[in-house]
Amino acid sequence: MCLRVKDEEPAQVYPEGPRRHHPSDVSTRQSVEKRINYMQNLQKEKRKLGKRFARPNPIPDTGILWT
């Protein structure tokens, strides 16, 4: 909305204030998403390593060993 007043520049009116979000809100949301992603990657890595080390190494046959 533009206000017209004699001998003055027109002024823009924002009755409800600015619509932009505060920058810290965005960074907080981004840090939360990053932390969630990090925790999901940790769980994947833990599962992968758990499967890898759950099986013991096979015991070699004594007849095959070279001495």
From Swiss-Prot:
Region described as Disordered: spans on this chain: 1-32, 47-67
UniProtKB keywords: Coiled coil
UniProt key word Coiled coil: yes
Coiled-coil spans in chain: 27-53
Protein name: Coiled-coil domain-containing protein 179
Lineage: Eukaryota, Metazoa, Chordata, Craniata, Vertebrata
UniProt gene name: Ccdc179
